[in-house]
Curated annotation (Swiss-Prot):
<dbReference type="InterPro" id="IPR029061">
    <property type="entry name" value="THDP-binding"/>
</dbReference>
<protein>
    <recommendedName>
        <fullName>Pyruvate decarboxylase 1</fullName>
        <ecNumber>4.1.1.1</ecNumber>
    </recommendedName>
</protein>
<keyword id="KW-0456">Lyase</keyword>
<feature type="binding site">
    <location>
        <position position="514"/>
    </location>
    <ligand>
        <name>Mg(2+)</name>
    </ligand>
</feature>
<feature type="binding site">
    <location>
        <position position="487"/>
    </location>
    <ligand>
        <name>Mg(2+)</name>
    </ligand>
</feature>
<dbReference type="GO" id="GO:0005829">
    <property type="term" value="C:cytosol"/>
</dbReference>
<keyword id="KW-0346">Stress response</keyword>
<keyword id="KW-0479">Metal-binding</keyword>
<dbReference type="Pfam" id="PF02776">
    <property type="entry name" value="TPP_enzyme_N"/>
</dbReference>
<dbReference type="GO" id="GO:0030976">
    <property type="term" value="F:thiamine pyrophosphate binding"/>
</dbReference>
<dbReference type="InterPro" id="IPR047214">
    <property type="entry name" value="TPP_PDC_IPDC"/>
</dbReference>
<keyword id="KW-0786">Thiamine pyrophosphate</keyword>
<dbReference type="GO" id="GO:0000949">
    <property type="term" value="P:aromatic amino acid family catabolic process to alcohol via Ehrlich pathway"/>
</dbReference>
<dbReference type="GO" id="GO:0000287">
    <property type="term" value="F:magnesium ion binding"/>
</dbReference>
<dbReference type="InterPro" id="IPR012110">
    <property type="entry name" value="PDC/IPDC-like"/>
</dbReference>
<keyword id="KW-0460">Magnesium</keyword>
<dbReference type="Pfam" id="PF02775">
    <property type="entry name" value="TPP_enzyme_C"/>
</dbReference>
Length: 610
């Protein structure tokens, strides 16, 4: 059994030479030449390739759809993703939308994946991955990288910025992913892939995996035909800390006269939805939700009082929360948007703030190494039932009036539109709200049990909802997605309505055409907030091109809206439906007017004295 090293003069093999500037070597000076018997003894089965191992891992964790844009560096890898049973490759129109789709998919499935090519694709998807990072979503971003032989050669490659050092893409991803794997050899590829995926799931953040374009089809002994199930060690609370934390929080809350609860967006990453509901059931406290956490707590619960969003909260919600003498916040994020320009009337000394792995009572003490679900479940057993705050809420509560019906041929108003959208919701639907006035109008929708709800508040990237609708609908095929998108946002990412059609999706898109960037107008107006009007239904019809199932309608009155809704929920219930809603450019929610003025004031603060 003889193995010869190529290029070793002792073996009688000439050292390979380069053909000249910009040329490949005649042979690989590091190649191993093995006899057939040796190869049979040392190599893995032909099916145990790097590409197949990665594909199987994605299926194993639930990312059975990968949103991709092909490029020459990832084509071979895409072949292996396509070949994997149980995995579907969804081709997108651009990398940004592929990333947004992986974001939306992760919101439903718990993890998403996208695949792009080196640098030109990677830097294009970067914005979407940054959004997933800010929203605590595990997204596996796979990049087809350069040939492994090109690392360290001082060569200039295409699809780069023209420097011999082509690590710029990696450096960009280092700040917006929790782990980066550069796979340019087979020996540690198995470990790097598994570590990256495990880290994404454990940290609930995106990861970056670059796979050299010449490795996807190669076998290695570590890529077994049936991969060993990946084990992610569970996090556990420190038992002593947990006991002390529960005791401190229970004592604090049990002394309060009218305590309340508020759910925040980090309930998702903590996987604490059921634990939060258990505290609400046991305590008798009224509970609200921060805007970015809508959909994470049960709105059908009898003591749910709405969205707490400072000055733009659900009617009577802020009064109850801010007048409480103690409040339990689970997983909050207090930024300038969620605090309405830092104008919340809350006091730290009254708050128990629980984060995914720590909590603090008032101004102290603070406790680390405790997990939110374990803490909340233990706390539920220690709280005395107290319905005082909820009783106060019931005394002052007056139901909101429905907007009056429009007169015949009267131009449609936005509040009338959302009155009818509310009537469409069920446990078999999900709402995706785009950045803009839809944030505020969709917050008013009372979600039935089982109804999903998603929007991107922390990052707030306009255009996100088109890709997110694609991804969410692909992941949750048992739900019909209702997307509310402004015209300005739609112009950013409209192309992937095409991909929705290719995938046979049946979402309903309400395109709100008011002629500009309404949310920006209310923060700071200017001519840059006016956009060129499109024939949006005509555009979608052109994309449809008689391929797939699609139905469009343009509505200007309430009568037309009723007709459209009857059609999309009846005869066209199995179609992708696109309804362009024409409204006045100044028709906005009162909440946006208030929020915009306060955020504008926060943005306009003068520099501090030096």
């Amino acid at each position: 059994m003889e193995t010869l090293l190529a290029g070793n003069p002792a073996n009688g093999v000439a050292k390979p030479t380069c053909n000249g500037v910009g040329a490949l070597p005649v042979a690989n000076s590091h190649a191993i030449i093995a006899t057939p018997a040796a190869a049979a003894a040392t190599l893995a089965p032909a099916g145990a390739t790097l590409g197949r191992h990665l594909a199987r891992r994605l299926v194993q964790i639930g990312a059975s759809d990968v949103f991709a844009v092909p490029g020459d560096f990832n084509l071979t890898l895409l072949d292996y993703l396509i070949a994997e049973p149980g995995l579907t490759l969804v081709g997108c129109c651009n990398e940004l939308n592929a990333g947004y789709a992986a974001d939306g998919y992760a919101r439903s499935r718990g993890v998403g994946a996208c695949a792009v090519t080196f640098t030109v694709g990677g830097l294009s998807v970067l914005n979407a991955i940054a959004g997933a990072y800010s929203e605590n979503l595990p997204v596996v971003c796979i990049v087809g990288g350069p040939n492994s032989n090109d690392y360290g050669t001082n060569r200039i490659l295409h699809h780069t910025i023209g420097l011999p050092d082509f690590s710029q893409e990696l450096r960009c991803f280092q700040t917006i992913t929790c782990y980066q794997a550069i796979i340019n050899n087979l020996d540690d590829a198995h470990e790097q892939i598994d570590t990256a995926i495990a880290t994404a799931l454990r940290e609930s953040k995106p990861v970056y995996i670059s796979v050299s374009c010449n490795l996807a089809g190669l076998s290695h002994p570590t890529f077994s035909r049936d991969p060993v199930p990946m084990f992610i060690s569970p996090r556990l609370s420190n038992k002593a800390n947990l006991e002390y934390a529960v005791e401190a929080a229970a004592d604090f809350l049990n002394k309060a006269v009218k305590p309340v609860m508020v759910g925040g967006p980090k309930i998702r990453v903590a996987k604490a939805r059921e634990a939060f509901a258990a505290v609400a059931d046991a305590s008798g406290y009224p509970f609200a939700v921060m805007p970015a956490a809508k959909g994470l707590v049960p709105e059908h619960h009898p003591r749910f009082i709405g969205t707490y969003w400072g000055a733009v909260s659900t009617t009577f919600c802020a009064e109850i929360v801010e007048s409480a003498d103690a409040y339990l916040f689970a997983g909050p994020i207090f930024n300038d948007y969620s605090s309405v320009g830092y104008s919340l009337l809350l006091k730290r000394e009254k708050a128990v703030i629980v984060q995914p792995d720590r909590m603090v009572v008032g101004d102290g003490p603070a406790f680390g190494c405790i997990l939110m679900p374990e803490f909340l479940r233990a706390l539920a057993k220690r709280l005395r039932r107290n319905t005082t705050a909820y009783d106060n809420y019931r005394r002052i509560f007056v139901p909101d009036r429905e907007p009056p019906n429009g007169k015949p041929n009267e131009p449609l108003r936005v509040n009338v539109l959302f009155k009818h959208i509310k009537g469409m919701l069920s446990g078999d639907s999900a709402v995706v709200a785009e950045t803009g006035d839809s944030w505020f109008n969709c917050q008013k929708l009372r979600l039935p049990e089982g109804c999903g709800y998603e929007f991107q508040m922390q990052y707030g990237s306009i255009g996100w909802s088109v890709g997110a609708t694609l991804g969410y609908a692909q992941a949750a095929k048992d739900k019909r997605v209702i997307a509310c998108i402004g015209d300005g946002s739609f112009q950013v990412t409209a192309q992937d309505v095409s991909t929705m059609l290719r995938c046979g999706q049946k979402s309903i898109i309400f395109l709100i055409n008011n002629g500009g960037y309404t949310i920006e107008v209310e923060i700071h107006d200017g001519p840059y907030n006016v956009i060129k009007n499109w024939d949006y239904t005509g555009l979608v019809n052109a994309i449809h091109n008689s391929e797939g199932n699609c139905w469009t309608m343009k509505v200007r009155t309430e009568e037309q809206l009723k007709e459209a809704i009857a059609t999309v929920t009846g005869a066209k219930k199995d179609c992708l439906c696109f309804i362009e809603v024409i409204v006045h450019k100044d028709d906005t929610s009162k909440e946006l007017l208030e929020w915009g003025s306060r955020v504008s004031a926060a943005n306009s603060r003068p520099p501090n004295p030096q």
